Amino acid sequence: MSQATASAIPSSQPKSGGLSQTCSLYLLASITVSYLASSSAVTPLYPIYQAEWGFSSLAIAFVFAVYAVAVLVALLVTGRLSDYVGRRPVLIAATAVQAATMVLFAFADGLSTLIIARVIQGLSTGAGIAAVGAGMMDVDKARGAVANAVAPASGTALGGVLAGLMVHYLPAPTHLVYLLLAAIFVAQVIGVLLMSESMPPRAGALASLRPQLSLPLATRQPILIAAPVLVAVWALAGFYASLAPSLVRSSFGLDSSLLGGVALFVLAGSAGISVLLTQRLEPRTLMIYGAAVLFAGVAIAVSSLSYHSAAAFFLGTALAGSGFGTGFQGAIKTVVPLAAPQERGGVLSVIFVVSYLAMGLPAVIAGYLVARHGDLFVTAREFGAVVMVLAALALVGTLRRASSPEPHCVRSQPKVTT
């Protein structure tokens, strides 16, 4: 029997008997926030770990890289799983593992334990992030697209600044921040247990575990349009996540633990606010604005290093963050709404694979260059120049397509079943 539209598939709305749609959306958004907060919470703690365990900037880049690689592996293997077994089972398992990983972080006694914890954290994040993103779109396509853009930035901001504040003002910060996150994850597991399933299980779960990246026909051209922006904005995120604490301390003589977290907070906080303020704009407009403002912000932030101006650095960071938020939102809105409900997990996994590759590879290269040449400022300027080039290419590419029809107007091709 032929299906006329994607809406003919089983309903993806939460069924009665569980949490309301609004509560489900907020719960799912909070899980994304927690995933990203737990990742960025490590950033302000790197100087403490370095002082206690005596490892190099290259080791920091490696710790960052293993997390990104683990996320990528999980996305490739389990990114489509929730499209087959449902959102809840994947989220319960991934979030429970996150809680256990926080306990491992809290009692880490060396670099090896830190690396192991980051690997497990990356695997659980990769398994859960596509499922939670698809779940938000299931609940409410319009608000879910906005939540998918604002929640990662909000989590990154909160994790960085809260960890920085704990380092600065509270005892045992390398324990407290993780134990707090563990408690939050446990509460979220309970919340997911109370939530109705938005994606009915169907056959094909085992086959979905074969590592692959697949996109529905309707999303292939749009993701080519969005990819340059994704690469630019997430390369920026990698720069701040890996180098910001050391950069703030070395260039401006400020306390790395607190101000390194604040730098990440300014970047991600500006991104989150920009998403909310620009959510009614067209996807292409968002990507054009995002690439242009990101270019300007990075230029100001990098220039501030030569003049040792913290004010200019944070101003540039705020502008770059605005570019990150709007650019990422534009990319999400360009691609994800075109996917049918049973395809959303797979589509989001492709988006996050591109994003984490763009975030992880430059950060690793930067860490290697710092360790080899010992010049943080030169590396930061070169990294910034690369991000600016990526932003410029994304801007030019998006403007060149400005005369073509908006990609979000394309509808997903109907599927035929017999």
What are these regions (language model features)?
Residues 147-193:
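Helix-loop-helix hairpin linking two adjacent transmembrane segments in secondary transporters
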Residues 54, 86, 107-112, 171, ...:
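Helix-breaking motifs and short loop linkers at transmembrane-helix boundaries and internal kinks
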Residues 176-192, 380-397:
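Symmetry-related core transmembrane helices of the 12-TM Major Facilitator Superfamily/SLC fold
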Residues 117-152:
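Cytoplasmic helix-loop-helix junction between adjacent transmembrane helices
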Residues 332-378, 383-384, 394:
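A late C-terminal transmembrane helix in Major Facilitator Superfamily
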Residues 259-283:
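Transmembrane alpha-helices of Major Facilitator/SLC transporters
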Residues 286-331:
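C-terminal transmembrane helical hairpin of 12-TM major facilitator-type secondary transporters
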Residues 72-111:
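Conserved MFS/SLC helix-loop-helix module at the cytosolic interface between two early adjacent transmembrane helices
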